[in-house]
Each structure stands twice: as C-alpha cells, then as structure tokens.
Curated annotation (Swiss-Prot):
Family: Belongs to the acetokinase family.
Oligomeric and partner information: Homodimer.
Underlying gene: ackA
A Pfam family it matches: Acetate_kinase
Organism: Chlorante-Aster yellows phytoplasma
PANTHER family xref list: ACETATE KINASE, ACETATE KINASE-RELATED
Cofactor: Mg(2+); Mn(2+)
Name of this chain's protein: Acetate kinase
Residues engaged in binding Mg(2+): N7, E379
Length: 410
C-alpha cells in the first residue's frame, strides 16, 4: 500500500510517498516559501528531479499542487492509490503517549496544545486539514515528536520550579526528535540482538539532542519544554542561566520575546563563530584555523560529552553509543572529537571505520569497552510504519467487533 509521510512547517511542506511494507520510496519532494509568488516546488523520483518556481499562497494550494503533480508525472494513476497519510506533529503534550488516528477529537486535542508549540503545532494543523479536505476518505495519522519521551520518570522530566507551574501550565521537559529516537532504538535492538539494551543516542543535525534509552524506552533527553534546552546547535544556545534573558533585555532595550528569539535563531554555531549555522562552513573554517569556529565547535562537543557522561551514570553502563542525523551520520571529525573526550570510559575509536558517511557502521575497535555506531535515521519511514501499524490495528479491531456482533446476534 502507498503511504505518504508529511512534515509541514509554517512556510514549507516536505513529503515522501512510500510503498509499504516494502519500505520503498516512490517519490519525495518539498514545497518551500509557501505564502509567496516565488514558492519552490521540488519533486524527486529514483531517476529524475523536477523543480519549479510558482505562486503558492497557502498550504491548501501546496497540497493540491503536489497531489496533482503525482498524477501528472504518472507516479500514481488516481488519488485512491494513496491509502494512508502520516503527519509529523511536534507537540503531543501529556495527552498522547503514542501516534494517533486523526479524528475530530484528536485534532481538537492537538489544537489545545498550540500554547506549548506556538511555532509548530499550528502549521502542522493547517497541513492536516488541507490533506483531509483533498483526501477525506483516507486513513490519516498524527505522529508526535514527543510521544517517545512520555516514558521518562517524573524525576527526569520535572523542573525544580513551583509545582503548580506543572499542574496549571504543564511546564515540564517534553523532548523532541522522538520519531528518530524510536526508529534508531528499534534498529539498535536488532543490531545488538537485545531488547533490554542500554543506548545513548546523539541526534545531530542543525538541531541537536541526546537521549538515554533503556529496554526500548526513553528515560531522559536533552531538549526540554522547547527544543531550546540542551546542547548548543546551529542557531540555538542550549542551556544558559535564565537570568541572562532579563539582563540582556534590559541592557539591549529588547523584549523578552526578542531575547528568546536571539537564543533560538542567532546563537549556537552562528552566534559564537559569527560565520554560519552550517556545520560544513564551521568545519571548513576550523581547517583554516579560525579561532571562533574552533570555539563554537568545542563548546558544542563539550556539552554533548557532558550529557553522554551523565547518561552513562544514569543507565549504569551502556551497550552502545549511536550517532545519527546529518552531522552525526556524515562528520567523522564531529564523532572523533566526542569519542576522544570519552576515553576515560574505555571507548576506543577505529579511525578507519570512522571515515564512514551516511551508512551503518561500527566505528569502535574490537577491544573498546563501549561500542559506538553510525546508524542513519529515517523519520519518514518511521512515520509510514506507524500509519501502517495503526491501520492494521484498526482493521483487526473492526474484524473483532464484527465477530463479536455475529456471535451476539447469531
């Protein structure tokens, strides 16, 4: 069956059409700059890539555009071939501990969580409604970034703030990148042959977070109430003293919102280096001896190592350290700098194997006390897998209900 995975932002819509359960990517694409007359629509199949610039004023138009293109390019013959749609939703709060079939009730619940993710959930909802309008009979599912972390114990997700903040406003750690962590966890359980494996995962892209996993469940993660908490990233500061916000607001004559915006969009690699938020630019500048680039990278690596060491203690040992996402999968320098700083734990890097890019590989030596792996993530596939799982569950439930009705009435 054909399932579409969708990841929508406020001005973008990323999609992938997969044949399931074969896990075959049929087509992928992206609509950027939604809301303008200079929107960019890119669609890629196995052997061809098309790109056009056109007017796309809203998400509804973007959805209609991509679905029309699938038919025009003969990727599918009719829309009826699409049997499921999975939507990435950033914030599921404490309401959702699993992906959810999209109904009027679940959509209303997602809308109720917009305060917790004002930049993301509204855009996710707009996209969901656009797909529901064009594909009203198609099975659709919300897959949340936060659900994987709902297994964290209170001691790990609560802040030491007035408790009523949590009771009244749900102030707590929610985490992010949960879909990626769930996928990597399942991959590692297969690789290690252990369901009860203790794993530390470093998801490093422009956004960076870490997760401690025990027996398939998240027990702690670095991102918090928002993705701003944790380690420095491309443009995010990571952890800072909260008093800095008030101090800078007063000194720079800015609102608190403006300072938070600076911490989200003008900090991290970009803020410290003054060069770029892109790791490739930072690494190129490091090779040239740029001290600010070196410093920006060292700060990030130091904070990542802090989390790994903390999670090692939390888990009381670890079976594997995993690097994934854009930087984690492709930067041998990034991985090397982290592992070197963890030598006290007995982890030993295999320099030759560490040259791998974008492929699964064990990158530590045979006598390393901890195994370290590169494992590519695949969030689009993970979303499609959840759609397939929930659809099969619903089909089985419908059969059980019919059987029960037959027995009662017969």
């Amino acid at each position: 069956m054909k399932i579409m995975s969708v990841n929508s932002g406020s001005s973008s819509l990323k999609f992938q059409l997969l044949e399931m359960p074969q896990q075959e990517v049929i087509v992928s694409g992206l609509v950027e700059r939604i809301g303008s007359n200079q929107a960019v629509f890119t669609m890629k199949t196995k052997d061809k890539k098309d790109k056009q610039v056109l007017e796309v004023l809203n998400h509804q138009t973007a959805v209609e555009l991509l679905l029309d293109a699938l038919i025009q390019k003969k990727v599918i013959n009719t829309l009826e071939e699409i049997e499921g749609v999975g939507h990435r939703v950033v914030q599921g709060g404490e309401i959702f501990s699993d992906s959810a079939v999209l109904t009027e009730k679940t959509l209303a619940q997602i809308e109720s969580l917009c305060d917790l993710a004002p930049l993301h959930n509204p855009a996710n909802i707009i996209s969901i409604k656009a797909f529901q309008k064009v594909l009203p009979q198609v099975f659709q599912v919300a897959v949340f970034d936060t659900t994987f972390h709902q297994s964290m114990p209170a001691v790990n997700f609560l802040y030491a703030t007035p408790y009523y903040w949590y009771q009244k406003y749900q102030i707590r750690k929610y985490g992010a990148h949960g879909t990626s962590y769930k996928y990597i966890t399942e991959q590692m359980q297969q690789i290690l042959g252990k369901k009860n494996a203790k794993i530390i995962i470093c998801h490093a892209g422009n956004g960076v977070s870490l997760c401690a996993v025990d027996s398939g469940k998240s027990v702690d993660t670095s991102m918090g109430f928002t993705p701003l908490e944790g380690v420095p990233m491309g443009t995010r500061s990571g952890n800072i003293d909260p008093a800095v916000v008030k101090f800078i607001a007063e000194k720079e004559n800015k609102t608190v919102a403006c300072v938070i915006d600076d911490l989200n969009k003008k900090s991290g690699y970009l803020g410290v280096s003054g060069i770029s938020n892109d790791t490739r630019d930072i690494l190129a500048s490091i090779k040239e001896g740029n001290q600010q680039a070196i410093l920006s990278h060292d700060i990030q690596v130091k904070r990542i190592v802090d989390y790994i060491a903390s999670y090692y203690v939390l888990l009381k040992g670890v079976d594997a350290l995993v690097f994934t996402a854009g930087i984690g999968e492709n930067s041998s320098f990034f991985r090397s700098e982290i592992i070197k700083r963890l030598s006290v734990l007995g982890i030993k890097l295999d320099e030759e194997k560490n040259k791998v890019q974008g492929k699964q590989e064990l990158i530590t030596t045979f006598d390393s006390a901890i195994k370290a792996f590169v494992v590519p993530t695949n969030e689009e596939l993970a979303i499609a897998q959840d759609v397939l799982r929930l659809q099969q569950n619903q089909t089985n439930q419908d059969k059980d209900d019919q059987q029960e009705c037959f027995c009662c009435c017969g």
